[in-house]
């Protein structure tokens, strides 16, 4: 498994996004040791993406997530910026398009969507044995992926206002032509037929614009799950990565055993996405088993029970359980951003506070020896999690 995190580049004094990605990208590549992962540019010069290499150990993945954030933060400081884990900018910004013909075509073709859509997500890749297995996985995880939106929710503010959503990034992202959930495919052949048909419409520039909630990667032998905000805390990134791997493993085992997938309509999954984006973990989510609204803690507990055998098999159960307990105890990035705004009344300060979470997490790692290690729990930045999941979630 591996992850891609998109980070917002903000001014160190004001918290306003700044177009310094070209310099940060060059500096990060020059600083990089061999075989680290990757640092790449995005469509707007106010953001950058960091990727891990593939890992089998969740703890090792977490260590590289921290290392990636620390690297781009260090380089960004040289340009008067922070690399902030923010899924949208709390302050108003007019993005600057990066160099490249494809990006300029997107800016020209899709109107206000890319111009107002400075959004940062988390993408999780999990290896599969074959495309056929991958499609079977897509068909079986689609009703569970809305829970990941709620867990990662980290974008309550946009363009200087509280949007009323926990994940406004999800709402903004849904404007892209192909974004969102799909109906069941049923076979690799059907997946190919559907996606090729989407490309034939001419609404998308290329295969890279198949912005499905989850898809077969066109570059790697993986399933790529794309619904999450970039989390405020690196520990949440690790927790979500562990859950996604377990979701994929569980779905693959169901397929191999002949278990049928649920025939939940895509419109229902889309509404589940919307509910998750609205309230995060502070309200209700859609129960994938009944299609009815239920308290968020109950739905997260259902997901945990669904994938627990895979978590145990991967050795991830304790780390993920503690990560979820910590998330419920401390709140999502959205709730913590709102708490910071209630204290400061300044959205620029909210952005700057978010930028420091990666710095503090790195300091906690050095002080406590948290990553990598066998007993990492979900202590990130020196904040211990609850001792178990039952008190916080169950």
Report the location of each language-model feature:
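C-terminal accessory/tail domains of diverse enzymes
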Residues: 1-79, 173-394
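Well-ordered mid-protein domain cores that form the structural environment of catalytic cofactors
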Residues: 53-120
């Amino acid at each position: 498994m591996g992850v891609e995190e998109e980070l917002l580049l903000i001014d160190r004094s004001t918290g306003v996004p700044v177009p310094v990605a070209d310099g940060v990208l060059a500096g990060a590549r020059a600083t990089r040791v061999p075989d680290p992962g990757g640092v790449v540019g995005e469509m707007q010069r106010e953001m950058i993406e960091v990727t891990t290499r593939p890992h089998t150990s969740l703890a090792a993945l977490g260590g590289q997530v921290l290392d990636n954030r620390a690297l781009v933060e260090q380089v960004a400081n040289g340009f008067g910026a922070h690399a902030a884990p923010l899924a949208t900018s709390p302050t108003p910004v007019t993005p600057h398009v990066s160099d490249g013909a494809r990006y300029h075509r997107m800016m020209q073709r899709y109107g206000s969507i890319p111009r107002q859509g400075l959004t940062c997500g988390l993408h999780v890749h999990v290896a599969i044995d074959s495309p056929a297995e991958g499609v079977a996985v897509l068909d079986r995880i689609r009703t569970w992926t809305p829970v990941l939106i709620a867990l990662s929710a980290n974008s309550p503010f946009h363009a200087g206002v509280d949007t009323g959503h926990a994940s406004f990034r999800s709402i903004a992202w849904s404007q892209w032509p192909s974004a969102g959930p799909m109906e069941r495919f049923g076979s690799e052949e059907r997946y190919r037929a559907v996606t090729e048909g989407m490309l034939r419409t001419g609404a998308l520039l290329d295969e890279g614009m198949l912005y499905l909630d989850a898809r077969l990667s066109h570059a790697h032998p993986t399933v790529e799950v794309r619904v999450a905000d970039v989390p405020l805390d690196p520990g949440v990134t690790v927790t979500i990565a562990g859950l996604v791997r377990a979701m994929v493993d569980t779905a693959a085992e169901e397929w191999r055993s002949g278990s049928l997938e649920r025939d939940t309509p895509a419109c229902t999954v889309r509404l589940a996405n919307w509910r998750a984006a609205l309230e995060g973990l502070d309200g209700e989510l859609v129960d994938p088993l009944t299609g009815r609204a239920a308290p968020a803690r109950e739905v997260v507990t259902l997901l945990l029970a669904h994938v627990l055998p895979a978590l145990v098999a991967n050795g991830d159960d304790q780390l993920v359980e503690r990560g979820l307990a910590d998330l419920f105890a401390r709140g999502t990035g959205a709730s913590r951003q709102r708490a910071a705004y209630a204290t400061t009344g300044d959205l620029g300060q909210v952005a700057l506070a978010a930028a420091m979470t990666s710095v503090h997490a790195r300091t906690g790692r050095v002080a406590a020896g948290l990553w990598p290690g066998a007993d990492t729990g979900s202590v990130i930045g020196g904040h211990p999690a609850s001792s178990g999941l039952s008190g916080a979630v169950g």
